[in-house]
Regions:
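Structured-RNA-binding interfaces characteristic of tRNA pseudouridine synthases
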Residues: 4-230
Length: 231
């Protein structure tokens, strides 16, 4: 094993995926995950046992434009060519955007200083087929300005205990949110127009379901169900 370690190199992958058909990133006893698919594909392709480590353990149904992951391997394939070699082996809803060699002590969870999550909403009376898998439908009009104002109360270092799922196992519920943006773009016109509302949350790390609960809270503010003083 010591002899084998001499030839080991660490590779960094940037992974994009559509999370619709996956039970999140992290391997689960019941249900297929992105991590499991990558481990099996890499192990089969490189003919050695691979265990990948991801920066963000995204929840079930969450998509990613660029989750950073690393693995160790003896492969002699040029690092920048790995993405092109691996992508044909992967299902169409997972793609390696880039690949490179990194120092052996590089760890995506500790080197990663910032994460950004987006929560997409279709705001309109008629559900659009193109949005059904990727947006939460809200049929009543949202007050975007109120949502923007409310979001700023959550920026900074706070105890987010009331903004995480009950099964959170984190040692502390204090987290730092560095920015929240709420923006709206037109989706469709006519008698029943629709707009896309995007809630973009950036921070150093998040609790289980924290971004979903923040988004749900801001939706309640936008609907007038919750006032700013309750944030």
């Amino acid at each position: 094993d010591r002899e084998r370690m001499r030839f080991m190199k660490r590779f960094k992958l940037v992974v994009a995926y559509d999370g619709t058909n996956y039970c999140g990133w992290q391997i689960q006893p019941n249900g297929i995950t992105v991590e499991e698919v990558l481990n099996k594909t890499l192990s089969r392709f490189l003919k050695e046992e691979i265990h990948i480590i991801g920066a963000s353990r995204t929840d079930s149904g969450v998509h990613s434009f660029g989750n950073v992951a690393v693995f160790d391997s003896e492969t002699t394939i040029p690092p920048e060519k790995l993405c092109f070699a691996l992508n044909p082996q992967l299902p169409e809803d997972i793609r390696i955007v880039s690949s490179e060699q990194v120092p052996g002590d590089f760890h995506p969870r500790y080197c990663d200083t910032r994460k950004t999550y987006e929560y997409h909403i279709q705001n309109g009376k008629i559900p659009l087929p193109t949005e059904r898998l990727y947006s939460h439908l809200v049929i009543f009009p949202l007050n975007i300005q109120a949502m923007q104002e409310a979001s700023q109360y959550l920026v900074g270092t706070h105890d987010f205990k009331s903004f995480c799922a009950a099964k959170t196992q984190a040692q502390t519920t204090v987290r730092t949110v560095t920015g929240i943006e709420v923006e709206a773009h037109p989706l469709s016109e006519g008698e029943y127009p629709s707009k896309k509302v995007i809630i973009r949350v950036t921070g150093e790390g998040f609790l289980y379901n924290m971004v979903r609960i923040i988004s749900g809270t801001l939706i309640k503010v936008g609907l007038g169900v919750l006032s700013l003083i309750h944030i």
